[in-house]
Design a protein with these regions (language model features):
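Cationic, hydrophobic amphipathic alpha-helical membrane-interacting segments
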Residues: 2-5, 10-106
Length: 106
């Protein structure tokens, strides 16, 4: 799991194409939520995160997933609100990813 996360971060660091369109960013958000869930489990197995902490991460991932679902459902009727929701959700996902990276380093 760490290899996957490091690979993704390396790709982003060298300037490879980042998701640009709403749908690309939405898909990247879903993928990152899935990755976040898997990383939390891996960190618990490696004894780098407590079970209670992992439950909290999973709950935050649930919130992020709900935000992505809401952004997707709003896209046709309220495009600007959908963009705003997607941007806010991306912030949550980035914070979760940063938190998990800090746990991996310990």
């Amino acid at each position: 799991m760490r290899t996957i996360l490091v690979s993704i971060l390396a790709v982003l660091a060298v300037g490879c194409a980042t998701p640009q369109t709403f749908n690309e960013r939405l898909l990247a958000g879903y993928a990152t939520v899935t990755e976040t869930r898997q990383t939390a489990v891996t960190l618990v197995d490696a004894k780098k995160m407590s079970s209670a902490d992992a439950v909290n991460v999973q709950q935050q991932a649930d919130t992020a997933r709900a935000g992505l679902d809401l952004a997707r459902s709003m896209r046709a009727s309220a495009p600007q609100q959908a963009e705003d929701k997607l941007t806010a959700t991306q912030t949550i996902v980035r914070a979760l990813r940063a938190y998990l990276l800090s746990k991996e380093a310990k």
